[in-house]
């Protein structure tokens, strides 16, 4: 149930009846403060201006046409023309009952779309590092949310599996007589990569051989393709371990690397030339874009094929967008790539639109994100100044969580402790990131993320177990509880119920904007409201069975909402802490 959408529809009809244009925006929002009701319609200002009347006068006319019987107990005009809506406790009670009767908690499904989500994108022959964390977990939270809402989601792991580095790596492996790359661990490959690069830079003969190998690889030579495949296989096997540890839904089947688009590039260049979009300039093939200016103020030239015939990332990204629309039949494409790539993507997509490869009706959205910083406010590094490997970060998270959990549960069996430490440690790293607005940089701080107070994973996981503990203490007759009515008579009951019923609205925002922090803030709010409700509205010692059962049902919906909400974020819940 989307109460915001229901009220928007009702207010919009009343505004039109009061003389507003048919496309008027009611601007119904969740109220920021309790005294302003549960929802507020703020659209009178803009519409009144167009109609040449005072907003308050319009609001009064709207109220004469606004029928919220059975939904609101009170509707009032505030300030210059805001309409405050207070939901009826009987309506809240009925909606709580309906939410509990459904596995989906009453969340409706919008029109089904095919949505491609591009995220993670590590490089072959390199271990994943902390720079891959944000794209991987924010993208996965978006995927989980969209799938829960019923969309057909195609995960696209755009791995860096093509380019000159493969000639270099194959040449170096050969030089070391270690063609059987399949037996090497990725840690070895990291060393190989460094050594290969050193030789490539210092030994012209080796560099020449590496360049020849690239040509052979690109021309489809069976031996070189086999060597390349081994490098990709080792990398993706290692990455899968990291994905599984992170509780991320990516698998090997989701890999759509740069190599996939390689055969399409000559055709793209030829087509852009034929359409008059690409021209020869100083030996290279270039698209000049009026939308972007160079330092001189002239249209910026975007190279799509170099003088030597090589292609660029832009060419690949053009082919990639075209493929996602024409072959995958995407209705919408989301890219979880850091903010530094914004101009590059905008240029590629401008070319895509001009060439007619993807119509304007299909959104290409760059859901960019900021950087992960250390406590010093600089990019997060090891003490020695190197890049932090993702596996090392997760090992440390597990170790810290293990100590924390053991301290609080000295008698817990070892296997249970390990399971709990894993949920808390990995959850803490993910939630610390997901709870921040993705567009900003954030400070990575172990102490904050593992704290049991504040908007953290341990607090949220504990809040969930606290609700479950009510049911462990109660001697519950499941049948009697299922048929018991919900009674909303206290303010704290009404506040908790109203917030629980805003779950669908929260999911809708996350799906539209790709902002998991909105879900984190919502769940934290729910946990806080439950805490106040638990303190002031006795559950097990309620004055009678009817009130007890009603409050148990509110607790039940709280537990289900927390669990489902955390699941859309990829955060594991536990039964006890």
From Swiss-Prot:
InterPro entries: aa-tRNA-synth_I_CS, Arg-tRNA-ligase, Arg-tRNA-synth_N, Arg-tRNA-synth_N_sf, ArgRS_core, DALR_anticod-bd, Rossmann-like_a/b/a_fold, tRNAsynth_Ia_anticodon-bd. Pfam families: Arg_tRNA_synt_N, DALR_1, tRNA-synt_1d. One of its GO terms (biological process) is arginyl-tRNA aminoacylation. Its EC number is 6.1.1.19. It is found in: Cytoplasm. The keyword rRNA-binding does not apply. A motif ('HIGH' region) lies at residues 122-132. It is an enzyme of class 6 (ligase). NCBIfam families: argS. This is Arginine--tRNA ligase. The gene is argS.
């Amino acid at each position: 149930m989307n109460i915001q959408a229901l009220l928007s529809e009702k207010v919009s009809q009343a505004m039109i009846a009061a003389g507003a244009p048919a496309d008027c925006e009611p601007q119904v929002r969740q109220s920021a403060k309790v005294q302003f009701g549960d929802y507020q319609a703020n659209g009178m200002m803009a519409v009144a201006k167009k109609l040449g009347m005072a907003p308050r006068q319009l609001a009064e006319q709207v109220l004469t046409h606004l029928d919220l019987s059975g939904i609101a107990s009170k509707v009032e005009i505030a300030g210059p023309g805001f309409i405050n809506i207070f939901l009826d406790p009987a309506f809240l009670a009925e909606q709580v009952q309906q939410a509990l009767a459904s596995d989906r908690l009453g969340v409706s499904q919008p029109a089904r779309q095919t949505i491609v989500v591009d995220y993670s994108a590590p490089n072959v022959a390199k271990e994943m590092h902390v720079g891959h964390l944000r794209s991987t977990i924010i993208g996965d939270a978006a995927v989980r949310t969209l799938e829960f809402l019923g969309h057909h989601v195609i995960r696209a792991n755009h791995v860096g599996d093509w380019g000159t580095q493969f000639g270099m790596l194959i040449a170096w492996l050969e030089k070391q007589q270690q063609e059987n790359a399949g037996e090497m661990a990725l840690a070895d490959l990291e060393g190989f990569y460094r050594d290969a690069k050193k030789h490539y830079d210092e030994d012209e003969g080796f560099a020449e051989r590496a360049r020849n190998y690239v040509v052979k690889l690109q021309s489809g030579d069976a031996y070189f393709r086999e060597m390349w495949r081994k490098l990709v296989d080792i990398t993706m096997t290692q990455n899968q371990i990291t994905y599984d540890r992170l509780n991320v839904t990516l698998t090997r089947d989701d890999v759509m690397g740069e190599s996939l688009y390689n055969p399409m590039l000559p055709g793209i260049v030829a087509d852009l030339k034929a359409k008059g979009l690409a021209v020869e300039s100083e030996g290279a093939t270039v698209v000049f874009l009026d939308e972007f200016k160079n330092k001189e103020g002239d249209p910026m030239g975007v190279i799509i094929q170099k003088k030597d015939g090589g292609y660029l990332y832009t060419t690949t990204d053009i082919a990639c967008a075209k493929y996602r629309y024409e072959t995958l039949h995407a209705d919408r494409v989301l890219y979880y790539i850091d903010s530094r790539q914004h101009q590059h993507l905008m240029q590629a997509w401008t070319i895509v639109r001009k060439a007619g490869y993807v119509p304007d009706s299909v959104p290409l959205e760059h859901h960019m994100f900021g950087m992960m910083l250390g406590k010093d406010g600089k990019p997060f590094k090891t003490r020695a100044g190197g890049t932090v490997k993702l596996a090392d970060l997760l090992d440390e998270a597990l170790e810290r969580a293990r100590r924390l959990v053991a301290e609080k549960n000295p008698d817990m069996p070892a296997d249970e402790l390990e399971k709990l430490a894993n949920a808390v440690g990995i959850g803490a790293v993910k939630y610390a990131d997901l709870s921040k607005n993705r567009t900003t940089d954030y400070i990575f701080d172990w102490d904050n993320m593992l704290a049991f107070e504040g908007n953290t994973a341990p607090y949220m996981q504990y809040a969930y177990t606290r609700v479950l503990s009510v049911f462990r203490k109660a001697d519950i007759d499941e049948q009697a509880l299922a048929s018991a009515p919900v009674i909303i008579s206290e303010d704290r009951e009404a506040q908790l119920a109203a917030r629980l019923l805003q779950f669908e609205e929260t999911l809708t925002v996350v799906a539209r904007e790709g902002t998991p922090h909105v879900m984190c803030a919502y769940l934290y709010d729910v946990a806080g409201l439950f805490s106040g409700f638990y303190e002031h509205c006795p559950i097990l010692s309620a004055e009678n069975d009817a009130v007890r059962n009603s409050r148990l049902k509110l607790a039940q919906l709280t537990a289900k909402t927390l669990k489902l909400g955390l699941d859309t974020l990829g955060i594991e819940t536990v039964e006890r802490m």
